[in-house]
């Protein structure tokens, strides 16, 4: 029996050190050395203070800001600890009611509903925390943001274009606009913080 227990204890100890301590330490050091911004959460700073992450959606509801995708992390919106979608299928009546309510909220905010509403403005993403919207969703909001900020639509459209990221490696994903970065660029363009 002793001959079986000793090798098991040694293997357990070695694997604990290798997989529980050495490997995580090496990967952490590698991440900090090669990808420091990403390893620390892709934080966006303004005046030396973190204002958010490029990877997590932020709540914006003032007319002067672009609005992101809706959060599915109720009751605390944009709570990364509660990440997850609504799990409502496309034929679920609850989803249809939620979309109708969101379209009504856009109308109440003074958005021109004569154009088709981009789907990402009235639905949540699978994670419920998506930081990006489509260029179509950004274009849909240009008039409202320009009016609220007393800017020309062309000036706001140029900021949208400057903050649009194309497909990764030219083929992966879709073009997207990071809402936090765009809103910070709007503030900076007007001399605000």
From Swiss-Prot:
GO terms for molecular function: ATP binding; P-type potassium transmembrane transporter activity. This is Potassium-transporting ATPase KdpC subunit. The keyword Nucleotidyltransferase does not apply. Part of the high-affinity ATP-driven potassium transport (or Kdp) system, which catalyzes the hydrolysis of ATP coupled with the electrogenic transport of potassium into the cytoplasm. This subunit acts as a catalytic chaperone that increases the ATP-binding affinity of the ATP-hydrolyzing subunit KdpB by the formation of a transient KdpB/KdpC/ATP ternary complex. The gene is kdpC. GO terms for cellular component: plasma membrane. It is found in: Cell inner membrane. Belongs to the KdpC family. It comes from Burkholderia vietnamiensis (strain G4 / LMG 22486) (Burkholderia cepacia (strain R1808)). It comes from the Bacteria. The lineage of its organism: Bacteria, Pseudomonadati, Pseudomonadota, Betaproteobacteria, Burkholderiales.
């Amino acid at each position: 029996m002793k001959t079986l227990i000793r090798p098991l204890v040694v293997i357990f100890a070695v694997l604990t050190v290798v997989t529980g301590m050495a490997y995580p330490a090496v990967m952490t050091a590698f991440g900090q050395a090669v990808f420091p911004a990403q390893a620390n959460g892709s934080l966006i700073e303004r005046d030396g203070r973190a204002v958010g992450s490029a990877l997590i959606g932020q709540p914006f509801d003032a007319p002067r800001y672009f609005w992101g995708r809706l959060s599915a992390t109720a009751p605390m919106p944009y709570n990364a600890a509660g990440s997850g979608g609504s799990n409502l299928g496309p034929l679920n009546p609850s989803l249809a009611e939620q979309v109708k309510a969101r379209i009504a909220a856009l109308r109440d905010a003074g958005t021109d509903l004569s154009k088709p509403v981009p789907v990402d403005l009235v639905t949540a993403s699978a994670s419920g925390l998506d930081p990006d919207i489509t260029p179509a969703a950004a274009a849909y909001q240009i008039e409202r943001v320009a009016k609220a900020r007393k800017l020309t639509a062309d000036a706001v459209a140029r900021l949208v274009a400057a903050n649009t990221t194309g497909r990764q490696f030219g083929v992966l994903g879709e073009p997207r606009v990071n809402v936090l970065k765009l809103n910070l660029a709007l503030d900076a363009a007007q001399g605000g913080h």
